[in-house]
Amino acid sequence: MKKLLLLFISFVAFCSCENEEFDFAAPVDVQSEVAVDSFYVSFDEALAQAEKALAGTTTTRASVVKRKVANHHEFVASRSTRATGDGVEVRFHVINFEDNQGFALVSADSRTTPVYAYSETGNLDIEDATENTGFGDFMDAATEYYIAETEWTGPENPLLPNDPNNPTLPITPVPTNPILQLPTVELDGERYYLDYREVVSQNSAGRIVPVIWGQGWPYNFYCGSLGVEDDYLGNRCAVGCGPLAVGQVLSVYRYPIFIDGKIFNWNKIMLSNSYNEAYTDGAICSEGAMATAYMLKAIGVNMNANYGYETSVTIDSMIMTLRNLNYNFAANEYSYTNMINSLNSNYPVIICGYDGYGLFGGHAWVVDSHRKVDKFETYYHSYEPYDVAFRNEVIGERYFHCLWGDSDLIHSWCLDVFEYFNSYNNKLIIYNIRPLHHG
């Protein structure tokens, strides 16, 4: 991966949850259509990267959690036709694991970051997922970032031990000195022993929000008739991204217990902590799902939601509802520092993208965790006393866990590519969200 320093220009938005169309070419036949390319990442290589990401650590193969592949295909983002003068193709591996044990979206170009998105649960249908407003915006930014990585002309990372092009020189290891057990690399004509380590870390609480809900059936049970039948919504209006985002944040604290005279039964609500638990054959709703649907409708009414196929609220009304619910928070233009500090304090974040403040035409969802990979390289002289020659700390991957709350893709970890997020003119975060009595 190139040493691209990223600014996390948030990728969350809200208001009317309008969908930006993002087209992909049909899945390709890997054997017949993949051109011979020195940068091409094979399926086996992509699978290894996927397993590392899903294991939550990249330090040793022993720590990798094994999953069985259910299916795999490649797709090419159609916008790649305008990518570069060299005709860079934006190609990804989509790897799904059996028993809904997760998926990974892995780059097929070795010049880029290996894993762009992954989840420990569920599977990814790329065409359905990009109908999700938030994930579609993410894929738009990911495509731009992918192209930028292939065009990067800055300094290369030093060749690492597992790089087949590494000019490793044979040595005779001396068991009594652990440095001599390290692999060797050659840089600028000098040979060094290299100690390379990757450390994965995230906010102390891990995922902050204990629920995974959606805008469709059964959570939209009380949202009124849609007038037509929809595969995702049933015959009901959508919950709305604003009410859903706020509702999921409330679940962290199980507070308040009522709004506008509507009482929330948190014991029942928390029984419906996952979309799969609540959704049974598109018809039968659990008691927990009904309690959740009741709460989400009450929140939407307080926001003056405009119910329909794309239920909408304003940013002003969303902020006012949080105040009505006796919550403390801050709301400002996007700041990476504020985002990370909020998550490190175990306070969830709602990120909003919009074209005009208080107007319809945006989107919102929740970010409830961050994960990063720090990479450390220590180079030792290849001669006695084998002291440290120099050290490098390489900026690695940064991921954010997003509760999309829409379509079949409810949540996933996504690469920080938001320097390239241009779907909206403005980006705002609501952060440090907690009840007033919480301090």
PLM region spans:
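Catalytic Cys-His active-site segments of thiol-dependent hydrolases/isopeptidases
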Residues: 107-108, 113-123, 369, 373-415
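Active-site-adjacent structural segments surrounding the nucleophilic cysteine of cysteine proteases
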Residues: 121-308
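Exposed beta-strand-loop-beta-strand "reactive/processing" segments of non-cytosolic proteins
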Residues: 62-110
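Short Lys/Arg-enriched alpha/beta "domain-start" segment
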Residues: 35-66
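Structural recognition of the beta-strand scaffold that forms the well-ordered cores
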Residues: 94-95, 105, 240-251, 295-298, ...
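Low-complexity, Gly/Ser/Thr/Pro-rich intrinsically disordered linker/tail segments
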Residues: 398, 417-439
